[in-house]
Amino acid sequence: MSDRHDPTAYDLGPDFWRGFVRRFWGRRPTVIRQPFARAIASPAEVFAAMIAATDRVRTEDHDVALTIDGVRVGADVERWLPRKKDGSLEGLTARISADLPGSNFAVFVRAFQLELGWEFWRRVRCFLRGLYARVGLPADRAEIDLFSGSYPRSRSGIHRDSADVFCFVIEGHKRIRVWPRAAFPEGGYWYGFGGGRRPRAGSTCLDGESGDILYWPSSYWHVGESRGGTVSSLSLGLYPRDSLAGAAARLLADEAARELGADNVIESLPASVGQLKAAPPRALRAFERASRNLAVSLMRHRMEQISGCAFAHVPLPSARGRIRASSLYAADRVFPIFWRSVGRVAIIAANGRSIALPRSKTLRRMISALNRGTPVSLSRRTRAANAHLRKALRFLMFTGAVETRGARAASRGR
């Protein structure tokens, strides 16, 4: 749970967020100048995460894109991806420029918080706490995307997103040109203009340097523009709307698919409806069981969202120990453990993940003690070190919600 620097230093406080929500949130863009004493992520951290993200390219359904001169690279993409020997974004730029003089490039990575890792994610969550306390969490998701390179403008052109965006400038000079919604015809999320001609009437430029944060609401059209040189930025998108029916359908589908495994796929249908079956009997039974468990599944999903600050993809801490009855365990002082019961099931959620266990008073007392800041041990909770308590503590260790404490340190903390 430790960070090289205190993640709470990225909490801007209630006074800042009170003024921000009143003046800007969902209303108009702004630039937040140098809000942190230390950058939320260093250029070295971001470049190392870029290298780690290249592993995704080797998967079938990846969300990493590299473009050169505005064209997405496909077959030989690994030739141009960042490498450790590049050393930095500047080194990658020099390598591409040497091979392709005069060319520009862009690297895009979706859900980049996974590669940036646990410490970075804790900093972002602390940044969001004050905003969420005033406006609530986005019902769909929060996500960090990487935009990096020497590109002259956003490949997508002028467009709107369904998210409110905080753009953290990591390296270089970042410019986002924005227009209010009324500047262009209605018709969804519209992409234009072709060629080099871009309308500027009615636009505003958000210019940021390393350490600044650019903000624009989802209602604003926007496009990234070059101010010269390479730039690296992290866009934190907050996506506010989620479909209740869509969420339920996804949860039902996921649970049934897990149970069916390879039997979840059919290859063909009969030529005559006389031979048609709605689904194999095993599949129908799986659908029925998933439907019966829907209330628990929905509660777990929402608790995962809340405990994970709305991030759908969350990193894990690097160090996770074994559960021992003699050890003392203490909870994260920054982010609490959540508990809810649905019927006879207890749901525990922490750091964007959850577990469902049989409800018990002993389990509830353990979670309450941890959230009060009281270290706990299995030997002190129950004579036999109840298997469900072990499972709960193993889950909390896995998610980084608790850590072991020496007896002496724990006694000082009481």
How does the language model describe each region?
Residues 2-23, 36-42, 47-210, 222-268, ...:
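Active-site region of the double-stranded beta-helix
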